[in-house]
Amino acid sequence: MRFWLILTVVCPLVLTAENPVIGNHRAAYDSKGMLLPWTSWKDALAREMNWYLQCPVENGYPRFVYMTFMQGDYQPVASRRDFIPSMEDGMGIISYLKYYAWSERKNPRILGFARSMGDYLVKESLTPDTGKFPRFTRSTGRRAQFPQPPDCGTQADKPYEIEPDKGGIAGYALLSRYEETQDQRYLDQALQNGRVLAANMVPGDEEHSPWPFRVDYRTGESRGPVSANMSFNLRLFDKLIEHGHTEFNEPRAKLWDWIKKNQIPNLAKNGSLWVQFFEDHQEPDNRNAWSPLNLARYLIERKEKLDPEWKQDAHALIEFAVRNFTSIRYGVPVCGEQTYDKEPWGGVLSTYGAVLAMYSAATGDGEYKALANQALNFVLYAVNDDGCPRENAVRPGRGGWQEDAHTDKIHNFVDAMTAFPEWAN
């Protein structure tokens, strides 16, 4: 693979001088120039989780549950009131549930914080009970709102817009939360999101996904014909079907048919069906790495139950990310987010590392194993000694965008440590 050629050139150069500072720590390399972790993964993650478990609770929620931009002293970033509830808290629920299980279910406070994220989604972040997308979880909002007002859209969303795919993320996370606690509220909201998605689904083709990227929840007026992230809507439908809700069989079949026949083949073309995911962007040609990597993750998890060609398709999805979004930082191949922002933010880089690790473990193919380990080592250099992380390891600091710093990161390390348990130590 071409990255190995790059590594043989870059890493020896790194070793000829004093090792650089990556994020918050002096980098450590082995004799072959491969980046080592600054502490064990298990220790770094424990420090980070402990730091978040000390987060002040106000209005019934830890602060990071209702704000996206939080500093290293748990205070809000004054200049940033925008907030991404479905993505931040949805992926946070998944992270906390996975870490709770991986850490042998020893600390009930972890489960309690997952409950706080679920409660915020079902109590504070819904659209009004009217219009085309009623009682649907919001993609964006404003920090410290209880509940979010009807016109709370921020970042690149207009005031009354939602992003359908983010409802898939929130719905899937809430259903996972329901499975842990049997709290009916979470199942009810997952069902509501699923039913609203099914009611607003349209036929996809070579230029349109089954849902647009943005929609005015009142009128259904759409903006952006393609939404790249279809894997979580598929996950939500699949999980609702598992719980006996067969009404989702037909929309699920139509969605998978479009993914398999249109979206995956588009990887080898211009990538036009892989544009639009991040809440703060609206460029129509903005391809991203997060969506194909998360579809690859689902194929790897389900294998032949979902896709008889899962190995081939997962490889193509990974290669799309490698081809379009990777670069070298401090001798380490890293993955960026999107066409218009190729910084190795913590969420996408940990996603990249986890999916490559999962593919390596599932197939026995070593093509990506070292790349996965290096990427994830890089991510953890953002974690300070006291456990407070920065949003990426490009420079020193504390806090920032919480989805990148924490909530869309922890579950990726759990997946990688499940694939290769020895990496935890």
Task: Place the predicted regions along the sequence by residue.
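Bacterial N-terminal signal peptides
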Residues: 4-14
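CBM-like carbohydrate-recognition segments
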Residues: 10, 58, 327, 331, ...
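Low-complexity, Ser/Thr/Pro/Gly-enriched N-terminal "stalk/linker" regions
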Residues: 18-88, 109-154, 185, 192, ...
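Solvent-exposed loop and edge beta-strand segments that line ligand/cofactor-binding
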Residues: 19-30, 34-41, 71-90, 99, ...
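Core register positions within helices of long alpha-helical scaffolds
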Residues: 95, 117, 170-180, 193, ...
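Alpha-solenoid helical repeat scaffolds
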Residues: 102-106, 124, 180, 200, ...
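Solenoidal tandem-repeat scaffolds enriched in leucines and small polar residues
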Residues: 164, 168, 175-179, 183-266
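Alpha-helical repeat scaffolds
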Residues: 249-252, 310-314
